[in-house]
């Protein structure tokens, strides 16, 4: 079992009944978490979310959660502790620690909700921080436990009540002051290009100076995509693109933050493919960040502010569908109706908005192809993004579209349900487990001997490309719509 110097205290592992070898004897154990029962956990008769009788005093038993959308007791009690989630959980696969599995984290939520945890200390928070939020457990669960709702509620509570170490706070502040703001990201493109093309990057690697940086900054540097002058000086897409041939749908396009800045060619390809299939494409200029990174990190107020702005931007256009080409954004956009359920002004508007949101492959798959596909003689390894396959339930549509390209061979990757380690900002704030998962995914991808790796999420593409390079097996990566665009244009291999 690998050593993890960042884990101060470990609990008893349910699968073995033996104390963890990684327990630090010098660190005081958190009360009530020193020993975890190995038998199935029974539901408590106490339910803090039950409305008390009028003559009873209103009490709140939790010492770590406030009453604003804590992890819901009724959702917690749906877990029957069967263990079907364990083989699909990335952190459980790495460490085989019960408290780093969905089942264990749900037990920790229950303890916190029922007042059995005295304070939100480092050990308690660490188990939730190490969850990637990949939702593989949601797909695997036979009881239909909504772990996605539970971890989202828990993370919002952590952000409100737990003060992180100073360096962690500063690093997260850096991330959230840049990533959700496309204009700020764009301002960094020229410095990134100079860093890559001036020889400075090569020199720092050659001298080993990057190893002096904190692991989080090393991870951020390793994930930098190649920046070209074309990317820096690319023109914005037009606000409206007319369909080719008979109009079939009016589709709004979500530009994304990282997508429009570092992967502008993916958005351009998306517009061309949709137009070729008879879709009028509308791109509202006022759209900003969708709030996905914020919501997944527990920054609820910030995420909801972004969501309201996005809804307002698209309400001005009467579209049939709203296309998303970044799976992490898509899963959040489809949840607007739930996220804004308490907002009287936006609840219904959010519900209508979410109903229109689809991954671009869903929209294309529902349309019978009208544009000619040219052959692409390639072996393509398709990577299922977690938020696409688990959160949005989109698995067959990308494969159907790729199968429609003549001479293209789609290769299935082993452990397709296991996360690549990207997971939003996870590979930045948790670089060690993210790196282990990235290399595991890279080895599985490399085993298929592909010409190209294809996925529907920019974070996955960066993570897999970086991981393949790290194991010495570099392979080009592309978004699904880029491959479709190449087939429609017939320009593959023509320079």
Language-model regions, residue ranges each:
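Iron-sulfur cluster-binding electron-transfer modules in prokaryotic oxidoreductases
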Residues: 147-495
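N-terminal glycine-rich anion-binding loops that anchor highly charged ligand groups
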Residues: 83-87, 97-102, 280-283
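Residue-level signal for mature regions of secreted extracellular proteins and peptides
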Residues: 24, 28, 37, 44, ...
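N-terminal intrinsically disordered, low-complexity tails
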Residues: 6-52
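Non-heme iron-sulfur electron-transfer modules
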Residues: 47-65, 92-126, 144-173, 473-483
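Cysteine-centered iron-sulfur cluster-binding motifs in ferredoxin-type domains/subunits
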Residues: 73-92, 121-145, 387, 417
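N-terminal glycine-rich, Lys/His-bearing helix-loop that initiates the first secondary-structure elements
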Residues: 2-3, 30-35, 40-44, 48, ...
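Short, intrinsically disordered, charge-biased short linear motifs at domain edges
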Residues: 63-76, 117-128, 242, 275-277, ...
């Amino acid at each position: 079992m690998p050593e993890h110097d960042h884990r101060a205290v470990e609990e008893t592992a349910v699968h073995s009944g033996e104390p963890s070898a990684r327990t630090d004897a010098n660190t005081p154990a958190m009360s009530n978490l020193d020993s975890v029962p190995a038998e199935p956990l029974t539901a408590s008769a106490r339910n803090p979310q039950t409305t008390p009788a009028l003559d009873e005093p209103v009490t709140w038993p939790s010492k770590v959660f406030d009453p604003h959308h804590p992890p819901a007791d009724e959702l917690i009690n749906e877990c029957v502790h069967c263990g079907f989630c364990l083989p699909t959980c990335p952190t459980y696969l790495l460490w085989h620690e019960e408290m780093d599995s969905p089942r264990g984290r749900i037990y920790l939520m229950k303890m916190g909700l029922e007042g059995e945890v005295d304070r939100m200390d480092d050990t308690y928070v660490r188990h939730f921080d190490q969850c990637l939020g990949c939702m593989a457990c949601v797909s695997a669960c036979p009881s239909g436990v909504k772990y996605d709702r539970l971890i989202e509620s828990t993370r919002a509570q952590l952000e409100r009540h737990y003060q992180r170490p100073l360096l962690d706070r500063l690093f997260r502040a850096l991330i959230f002051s840049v990533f959700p703001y496309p204009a700020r990201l764009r301002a960094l493109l020229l410095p990134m290009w100079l860093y890559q093309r001036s020889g400075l990057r090569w020199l720092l690697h050659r001298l080993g100076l990057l190893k002096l940086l904190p692991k989080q900054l090393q991870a951020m540097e390793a994930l930098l995509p190649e920046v070209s002058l074309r990317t820096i000086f690319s023109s914005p897409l037009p606000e409206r693109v007319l369909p080719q041939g008979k109009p079939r749908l009016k589709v709004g396009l979500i530009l994304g933050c990282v997508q429009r800045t570092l992967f502008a060619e993916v958005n351009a390809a998306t517009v061309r493919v949709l137009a070729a299939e008879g879709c009028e494409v509308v791109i509202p200029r006022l759209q900003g960040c969708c709030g996905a990174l914020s919501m997944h990190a527990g920054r609820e107020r910030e995420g909801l502010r972004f969501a309201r702005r996005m809804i307002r931007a698209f309400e001005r256009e009467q579209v049939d569908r709203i296309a998303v080409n970044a799976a992490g954004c898509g899963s959040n956009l489809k949840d607007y109706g739930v996220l804004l359920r308490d907002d009287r002004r936006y609840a219904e508007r959010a519900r209508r908005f979410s109903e229109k949101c689809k991954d671009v492959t869903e929209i294309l798959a529902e349309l019978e192809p009208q544009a000619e596909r040219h052959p692409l003689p390639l072996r393509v390894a398709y990577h299922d993004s977690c938020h696409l396959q688990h959160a949005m339930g989109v698995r067959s549509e990308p494969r159907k579209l790729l199968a429609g390209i003549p001479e293209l061979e789609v290769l299935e990757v082993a452990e397709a349900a296991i996360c690549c380690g990207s997971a939003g900002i996870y590979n930045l704030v948790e670089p060690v487990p993210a790196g282990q998962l990235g290399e595991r995914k890279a080895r599985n991808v490399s085993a298929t001997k592909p010409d190209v790796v294809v996925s529907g999420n920019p974070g996955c593409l960066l993570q897999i490309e970086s991981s393949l390079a790290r194991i010495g097996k570099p392979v080009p990566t592309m978004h699904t719509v880029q491959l479709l665009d190449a087939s429609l244009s017939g320009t593959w291999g023509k320079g």
